[in-house]
Every structure is written in C-alpha cells, then in structure tokens.
C-alpha cells in the first residue's frame, strides 16, 4: 500500500474508541504511523487498540496531545474540547474523521458503501467476496466482523472497502471508485434539516465517481429508484428482488438456517443474462438477501467468478450486533441487534419471525429523544412482527428529554395502534424477572437499540438462567413459582 508522501508525525485521535475512528486508527497504525488517542470510555475498541500497542488516555485534557503533530476528530467532538483547543493554539492540523478516511482511500482503489440502513452488513459482505476471490482488501467498517474480531484490517491487495457514514454529510468527500447505496430514508435530520438535503447528499456521493467507476443501487427502495434518472453520465447497476433489477434475487426461501436464493444477472447494454443458482446465506431476513445482492453486483462487475461468490456467501460469519445470538436459557434464545430506526426494527423482527415458530419478544431501548419524537408514528407501527414488546427508558446519547418522547408514551402509542401485549420496563435490573415470566421455551428475545442495551443482551442469558433456577427451587419446595 502506498504511504502518505510526507512525514506527518504522531497522529492523535480524539474519541478514538468510536467505531469509525478506531478503524482508521488501526489501519494507520498497521501502516507504520505513530498513533495515539483519548476517549471518555474505556470500551472494547479502546482495549483492542491498546492490545495493538496504541497508547490511549481516558478522559480529555490538553496534556494528552504530547508531541502529536496532527489531531483527528469526529463530528461528535466539539470545538470546546480541551484537546482540540490546545491543538489549534499550537497551530496543528485538525482533521475530520471523513477527511482522514478519504486520504486513506486515495492510497488504493476504493469501494464505498452508503445508505440509511444495512451499510455495515453490506460492507462486510463486499469484503467477504473480495477476500474469497484472493484480492485481500483493506477494510474499514462500522461494525465488528465476527471472522476477524475487528472492524478494520490492512490487506495487501489494491482494493479498500469502507463504510460511508452519511450522518454528517462528509461522505460526499470520499474518493470512491465504486459506490453502493442500500436505501435512503429520513434520518439525521438534526444535521440536514430536510429530507431534500439528504437526497442531495446521496446524489453528490454518486456524482463523485470517476468515469471508469460505477454505482450499485437498490432499485427496490423507492427513493433510490427515483434518484437513478437523475444520475446521468454515470454507470449504474441496480439490484433487488424487482424484475427490473440488473442483479435480481429469485426463488427466495427464508428459514431457521438462513436464506436460500438464485441470482439472475442481466446485462442491460448487451441484453444477455446468466443465473447463479442455489446461493445459501447464513443470515436471517429478506433485508439481508438485498444486502447480499448488492455485494454480488459489485463482485460480478469486478469479474469475480460465480462459484467464488457462492462459496464466499456460504462461509460468511456475520457482524457483531447484527442479529447476534448471545445465549440461551431454558430454551429461550436471546438476540442482540443494533436496529434503532423503525425501518431497521421492522426488518429485524421480520427476520426473527422467519427464524422461529414460537413467539418473538422485542426489548427496545429507544435511541435519542429526537429520533423517537420525529419518527413517533413509525415507531408505533414497526413492532407488528413481535408478539410482545418491552419498552425501556430512552437512551439519551447526550440529549435533553423531549415531552411526549418517553417509554410510557411509546408504550401507549403501541397499544393505541393495536399492539396487544406491551410492557413498560421499570429499569434494567427488572428485565430478567420480566422475561422469565413472559417467555417460553422456543421463544426469541430480540434486544434492539444503539445504546447500552447490548450489555443487557449479553448478560441476559445467565441472568435468565438464574431466575429460572430460583423458580424451579421454589416450585420443588411447594411454593408459588
């Protein structure tokens, strides 16, 4: 891999424990650059980077910079941060995360995966197919790849696969050779202001492509389909389950072992087509079939053999916090999932419905008061595939409460919209007892959210087992369970 042309000295990452920042830091470290950082939380990403030999301070103060010559920040870091203030007082370059990612992308041919939902899984699937083809890509992802135990790794090949985060608009600056768009929904309106601005950003993302590149776009999503006619003078490949898709999924079957489907690949210019039959994907849900079709579209256009595509998908090991099984207790299976937008929640619960013949119990920790408030009606209707819903306190993520955006309001909204079984969770400690009371063997408990609920999901199987054990002892002693 080519290096940056000048000696840039030590790089200091403010908020290095974030999923996007940690990936960039890891790749730069593996390239031989001196990397250091700070974070408010001593989280799993911080521990992983420390194990690589990267020094990280907990807390933010000017002294953390040391002899740093460049400071890298995410959009979440404020100008009032003492490390940022000290960097600017010392006339050091202060670089946004996306700008640093863009500089890394210039060192290779790059594939950037964007979209409101599904981009982490799709990025992982693209990387998997390039790996299967022996292309050994560099990868910077927004989630931990189960096969690697990290969200980023440095490959020896000429390609880089990155997740393009649209949350602050900076993804429009990424110099991709190939772009993929999964879907476009109203999200991050606190930054964009209007949905039209979101649409404009995605158009700019595609228009940045060079003439020799191409975009792979999900035609099943109405917003993406509506954008295609506006993207003149760019090569576009579409994918989806629609008969209009260039990369079309057919004969889809979904079950407890994942998905099985065929893919019909059509060349619009030449008029020919071929079929890859019997693809098996060890993931649940129609939405993951779509994610796989996007990855297939890129792999096929890059000339990767059909047999390699089939084998690569079959051996895909998934991404942490994407329908991740954390354990079982008394026949009850606990699932951890990052889904926190109504579209994501609905897709995950539909996948859960396909994965079990028994009940699906959703435990949701709404993420941000602003999101719950602006999408309240959507939240009230996205749990239809859950037999029971448990609503926890809103994870504030630094926000102040908004009247009408609370767990009580959401629970009442679900009931008003026709949901038959809704529970308000008193606190985290009450979850094991509640689940023990309402769950039966064979049920799936799906924990949903982008906040601290992942910790709950990982602890729940053992906690549930303990509650079940106490209940059995009480029953044997002749008391009420």
From Swiss-Prot:
One of its GO terms (cellular component) is cytoplasm. InterPro entries: Mur-like_cat_sf, Mur_ligase_C, Mur_ligase_C_dom_sf, Mur_ligase_cen, Mur_ligase_N, MurCDEF_pg_biosynth, UDP-N-AcMur_Ala_ligase_MurC. Its EC number is 6.3.2.8. It is an enzyme of class 6 (ligase). The keyword Cell cycle applies. GO terms for biological process: cell division; cell wall organization; peptidoglycan biosynthetic process; regulation of cell shape. The keyword Cytoplasm applies. HAMAP family: MurC (MF_00046). This is UDP-N-acetylmuramate--L-alanine ligase. The lineage of its organism: Bacteria, Pseudomonadati, Pseudomonadota, Alphaproteobacteria, Rhodospirillales. The gene is murC.
């Amino acid at each position: 891999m080519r290096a940056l042309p000048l000696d840039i000295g030590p790089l200091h990452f403010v908020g290095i424990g974030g999923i996007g920042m940690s990936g960039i830091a890891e790749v730069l470290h593996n390239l031989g650059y001196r990397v250091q950082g700070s974070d408010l939380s001593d989280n799993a990403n911080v521990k992983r980077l420390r194990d690589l030999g990267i020094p990280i301070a907990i807390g933010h103060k000017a002294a953390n910079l040391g002899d740093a010559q460049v400071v890298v920040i995410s959009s979440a870091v404020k100008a009032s941060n003492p490390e940022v203030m000290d960097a600017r007082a010392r006339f050091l370059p202060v670089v946004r995360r996306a700008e640093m990612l863009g500089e890394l992308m210039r060192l290779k041919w790059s594939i950037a995966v964007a979209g409101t939902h599904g981009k982490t899984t799709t990025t992982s699937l693209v990387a998997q197919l390039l790996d299967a083809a022996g292309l050994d890509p560099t990868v910077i992802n927004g989630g931990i790849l189960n096969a690697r135990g990290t969200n980023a790794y440095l490959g020896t090949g000429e390609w880089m696969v990155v997740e393009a985060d649209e949350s602050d608009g900076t993804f429009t600056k990424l110099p991709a050779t190939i772009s993929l768009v999964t879907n476009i929904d109203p999200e991050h309106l606190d930054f964009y202001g209007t949905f039209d601005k979101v649409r404009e950003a995605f158009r700019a993302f595609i228009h940045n492509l060079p003439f020799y590149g191409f975009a792979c776009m999900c035609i099943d999503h109405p917003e993406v389909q509506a954008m295609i006619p506006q993207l003149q003078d760019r090569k576009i490949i579409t994918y989806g389950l629609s008969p209009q898709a260039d990369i079309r999924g057919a004969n889809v079957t979904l079950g407890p072992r994942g998905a099985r489907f065929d893919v019909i690949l059509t060349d619009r210019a030449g008029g020919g087509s071929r079929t890859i039959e019997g693809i098996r994907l060890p993931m649940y849900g129609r939405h993951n079939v779509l994610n796989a079709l996007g990855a297939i579209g890129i792999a096929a256009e890059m000339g990767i053999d059909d047999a390699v595509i089939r084998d690569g998908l079959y051996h895909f090991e998934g991404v942490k916090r994407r329908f991740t099984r954390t354990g079982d207790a008394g026949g009850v299976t606990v699932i951890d999932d990052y889904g926190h937008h109504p579209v994501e929640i609905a897709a995950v619960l539909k996948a859960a419905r396909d994965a079990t013949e028994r009940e699906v119990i959703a435990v949701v920790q709404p993420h941000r008061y602003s999101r719950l408030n602006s999408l309240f009606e959507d939240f009230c209707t996205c749990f239809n595939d859950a037999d029971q819903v448990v609503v926890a306190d809103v994870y504030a993520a630094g926000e102040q409460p908004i009247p009408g955006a609370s767990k009580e309001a959401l629970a009442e909204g679900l009931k008003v919209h026709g949901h038959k079984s809704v529970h308000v969770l008193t606190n985290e400690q009450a979850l094991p007892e509640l689940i023990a009371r309402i769950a039966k063997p064979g049920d799936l408990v799906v924990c949903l959210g982008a906040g601290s609920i992942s910790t709950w999901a990982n602890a729940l199987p053992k906690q549930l087992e303990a509650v079940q054990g106490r209940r059995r002892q009480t029953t044997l002693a002749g008391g009420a369970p």
